[in-house]
């Protein structure tokens, strides 16, 4: 099992949490992006640069993810595909998606797309705050503990 990161849109502060967790636990973290990324030197952190283009990084993650792998993404359709393949999807705010919540999120995303297409300004998400970072770290730790326990 390993951690995949949809890295193009992942906040740097969340990447830092992941880097520390990789070194602390020995869990492999792979950042997938369509641009070069800077990472600290570690045998547990790697980058995978893909071609530019719509959903190229997402498709690469879906192709490589395995059952019980963790994927860090704020992309709802990517999270849905990860769950469909038996993976675990966690957004950078610490929300762990489930088969039930992902359906709700997909419906809301489609509704908001319709609103934007009709010219209504919907705004974006709030800035990532300390509470979000703590929630992410807590959910990551839960997954790491469950995964490490399952491997023993």
Swiss-Prot record:
Return the Pfam families for the record. Answer: DUF188
**InterPro entries xrefs:** UPF0178
- In which domain of life is the source organism classified? Bacteria
What PANTHER family does this protein's entry cite?
Answer: UPF0178 PROTEIN YAII
Instruction: Identify its protein family.
Output: Belongs to the UPF0178 family.
Annotated protein name in UniProt: UPF0178 protein YE1167
Q: To which species is this protein native?
A: Yersinia enterocolitica serotype O:8 / biotype 1B (strain NCTC 13174 / 8081)
């Amino acid at each position: 099992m390993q951690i995949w990161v949809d890295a193009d849109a992942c906040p740097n502060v969340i990447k830092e949490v992941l880097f520390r967790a990789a070194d602390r636990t020995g869990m492999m973290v792979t950042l997938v992006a369509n641009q070069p990324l800077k990472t600290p030197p570690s045998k547990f952190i790697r980058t995978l640069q893909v071609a530019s283009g719509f959903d190229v990084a997402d498709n690469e993650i879906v192709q490589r993810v395995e059952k019980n792998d963790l994927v860090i993404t704020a992309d709802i359709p990517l999270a849905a595909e990860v769950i469909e393949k038996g993976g675990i999807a966690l957004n950078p705010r610490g929300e762990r998606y489930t088969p039930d919540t992902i359906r709700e999120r997909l419906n809301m995303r489609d509704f908001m797309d319709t609103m934007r297409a009709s010219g209504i300004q919907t705004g974006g998400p709030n800035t990532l705050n300390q509470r979000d970072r703590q929630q992410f770290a807590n959910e990551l730790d839960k997954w790491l503990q469950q995964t490490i326990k399952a491997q023993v």
